[in-house]
Amino acid sequence: VSLAPRAVLVHRTTEYEELVARHGTHGQAAYFLRSRGRDIEEVAERHRRTRRALAEVSAAIPLTWRQTQVERGDLDRFLFAPEDVVVVVGQDGLVANVAKYLAGQPVLGFDTDPGRNPGVLVRHRPAAAATLLRSVHVVGTGVDELTMVEAVADDTQRLVALNEIYLGAVGHQTARYRLGLEGDGGVVEAQASSGVLVGTGTGATGWLRSVWQERGSALALPHPSEGRLVWFVREAWPSPVTGTSLVSGELVGAAVLELTVESEGLVVFGDGMEGDAVELTCCLLYTSDAADE
């Protein structure tokens, strides 16, 4: 007998909740914000909208389904199951945060603050939850399959991300490494920089886009479902032993970007989740082969 679907509601602690937890009471939090020229009512109203959205989406889950909730900070300890339907209630970045822990489960994104969030990944309003949840397993329902980026270390540690993967020193200080493209005639360059970003078309709406735009890059950014990645070296430093000729490019199909670590304390993390970083000691390969996640 197959298990009934389980709706996993993914949410994030609101700014209001964080403020009250830090300062102890609503009044103390209000005083703290007031001393910085802010009004707590604006923060509290966003909190109330988020809680209302979460309650509305939760109430729309079919009665025959199981359901549970997980906060963003607990994602790395949560065990997702094959029959799960992941329901993200919050900001676009929350979809990217949860994607790395999934293996083909469908994801629905609901925007708690339309107009404030771009709505690239949380495209739906809570009022549409009942209809969307009922149609998840209906044959013919349109689904967007998004490309992901994968990094594999020489010790077989693997990291997958929906937006981008960053390699660099803890604290974003100078990172030293050798960078090269597999199958590019053996061209390898020693570099010192503040890190390397490799991202997808989904990531092209966030951190990756800011680097691309600031440089006025001629590279065409990929679409979210396109099997192509783009990469950028941040602030490469020219010196007698380090170069700046390989600072951006694209990875198409099975193309691989290879980095060999030459300084201590380098880490790699995905989608801004620094707390889930992997420490590197030797080599790292970037590829877009993780698109089937």
Predicted regions and their residues:
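A conserved acidic, glycine/proline-rich C-terminal tail/linker
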Residues: G243-C282
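A short, gly/pro- and small-residue-rich
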Residues: A99-T112
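Short glycine/serine/threonine-rich phosphate/pyrophosphate-binding segments
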Residues: L94-V98, T205-L208
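Short gly/pro/ser/thr-enriched loop/turn and capping motifs at secondary-structure boundaries
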Residues: V95, D113-P118, P238-S239
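Gly/Ser/Thr-rich active-site loops/lids in small-molecule metabolic enzymes
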Residues: V188-S239
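Catalytic core of DAGKc-family lipid kinases
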Residues: D113-S194
